[in-house]
Amino acid sequence: MDTKLQLRTYRRWDGLTADAVALLTSPREDPLAIPLLVSPSTAHARAVGQAVAVEVGVAAGLQGRTASALRRELSQSLLDMDPQVDPWSGSALTLRIFDLLRPDDPDMAAVSEHVQTCRVRGIAHADWTTAQQFSAVLQSLIRHSPAVLEQWRAGEDVDAEGSALPWDKTWWPHVWRLLHDDGHPDPMTQLTQLCSALGAAPLRWPSCVWISPAAPEWQDYSLAQALS
């Protein structure tokens, strides 16, 4: 893959599309090697593909991928990870959290008190609801504040501003650390491993066009850098 990273910003979609088409249809040593197109959505990729077809008559083999889909594809091929099994998202993460909410764990005092209060009030399944809510919190932190999670892993139980967590949230870092006991590398570790593997692996794409919003997520930025 061409290792020259060029960053371009656009205010208009037509200007972006014109440049993307020029890059995707430029001459290459192996005409059968299809460039990689990464876009925010399948709709964006389809629009670029249609523009390529208008320019050269056909867009055969050009299949756009979102950044998350590319991460899954590369993780499967380079790290042998099953893209259908993600212990750090959805119901899988909720279930793992639920299994850790033990009433005899002193670090779970806030959760135990909440669940007991709900039972007295006749509210069922408060522990499962709590697991669902914390699963959503973790997935948001993974996307937007991975540094906080790294601090928790290191034993620094603080919020995004570096302040101590309130009592009702002191169990959050405890559960985050417990989630690592089953050996599943967290998303930050997975991405580090993937980026390292990319540095040593031959890739089938001769070049890459990566269309990103103005403020890409950190995972997307790191992967784009690793591909450059």
What does each model-found stretch correspond to?
Residues P31-H44, C208-P213:
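Conserved RecA-like ASCE P-loop NTPase motor core of nucleic-acid helicases/translocases
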Residues K4, I34, V58-G61:
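A generic structural signal for alpha->beta connector loops
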Residues L223-L227:
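Catalytic-core regions built around general acid/base machinery
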Residues M1-L24:
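N- or domain-start disorder-to-order transition segments that initiate the globular core
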Residues S39-L203, A215-W218, S228:
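Basic/charged alpha-beta structural segments of nucleotide/phosphate-handling enzymes
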Residues L23, E29-L32:
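An N-terminal domain-cap segment
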Residues L16-D19, Q190-L194, S222:
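Well-ordered alpha-helical segments embedded in enzymatic catalytic cores
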Residues T9-G15, G183-P187, S212-A214:
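Short, flexible loop segments at the rims of nucleotide/cofactor-binding pockets, characterized by
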